[in-house]
UniProtKB/Swiss-Prot annotation:
Domain of life the protein comes from: Eukaryota
Parts forming coiled coils: none
InterPro entries per UniProt: KH_dom-like_a/b, KH_dom_type_2, KH_sf_prok-type, Ribosomal_S3_C_sf, Ribosomal_uS3_bac-typ, Ribosomal_uS3_C, Ribosomal_uS3_CS
Record-level GO BP terms: translation
NCBIfam families the UniProt entry points to: rpsC_bact (TIGR01009)
Pfam families per the UniProt record, alphabetical: Ribosomal_S3_C (PF00189)
Keywords attached to this entry: Chloroplast, Plastid, Ribonucleoprotein, Ribosomal protein, RNA-binding, rRNA-binding
Protein name, as recorded: Small ribosomal subunit protein uS3c
Family: Belongs to the universal ribosomal protein uS3 family.
PANTHER family: 30S/40S RIBOSOMAL PROTEIN S3, SMALL RIBOSOMAL SUBUNIT PROTEIN US3C
């Protein structure tokens, strides 16, 4: 049987870069990793609680963390930064305070920057949130997948594959449904592929959404 590998980790150092940039002593490594997870969860929870657009999407494509001895630099790549920047200084400061409180970092400065990404629907995380929103509103899964593919086509991508697994439409037996448009060369390391897996809780149970987007050939 073919073994599935995470397309992002498979391409690290060629077409993908690390989302966390820092060094640590081997014994301290796990602490740094836990800290990163806390930061990411804290930001996502803050955005979920305070900023909601009609479709219920957070619009975060990715969060990059760079650490130095006296500074933690966090860059949030958002598809719809208006959500966080409407009353910008106050919102960002509030988020900074929340993260600082969560981390309890006294001797390190925390800096948060927000970057807008063009073509938000060309990013799998934002697309997965869109599909999750549709499934929660009981839209048929095929309709949701086709709509997602239409949105990515507007973002000038070369190919997309969407997979939904679980008790689809409340059926007794769980199954996997997928749809592909264009090319998605998972075996080619030079192919820049964006990927995300997303869990959505519907009234029928938990569904898993996986999205592969073929952005460009290096």
């Amino acid at each position: 049987m073919g073994q599935k590998i995470n397309p992002l980790g498979f391409r690290l150092g060629t077409t993908q870069s690390h989302r966390s940039l820092w060094f640590a002593q081997p014994k301290k490594y796990s602490e740094g990793l836990e800290e990163d997870k806390k930061i990411r969860d804290c930001i996502k929870n803050y955005v979920q609680k305070n900023i909601r657009i009609s479709s219920g999407m957070e619009g975060i494509a990715r969060i990059e963390i760079q650490k130095r001895i006296d500074l933690i630099q966090i860059i949030i790549y958002m598809g719809f930064p208006k959500l966080l920047i409407e009353d910008k200084p106050r919102r960002v400061e509030e988020l900074q305070m929340t993260v600082q409180k969560e981390l309890n970092c006294v001797n390190r400065k925390l800096n948060i920057a927000i970057t807008r990404i063009s073509n938000p629907y060309g990013h799998p995380n934002i697309l997965a949130e869109f599909i999750a929103g549709q499934l929660k509103n009981r839209v048929s899964f095929r309709k949701a997948m086709k709509k997602a593919i239409e949105l990515t086509e507007q973002a000038n991508t070369k190919g997309i594959q969407v997979q939904i697994a679980g008790r689809i439409d409340g059926k007794e037996i769980a199954r996997v449904e997928w749809i592909r448009e264009g090319r998605v060369p998972l075996q080619t390391i030079e192919a820049k592929i964006d990927y995300c897996s997303y869990t959505v809780r519907t009234i029928y149970g938990v569904l898993g959404i996986k999205i592969w987007i073929f952005v460009d050939e290096e």
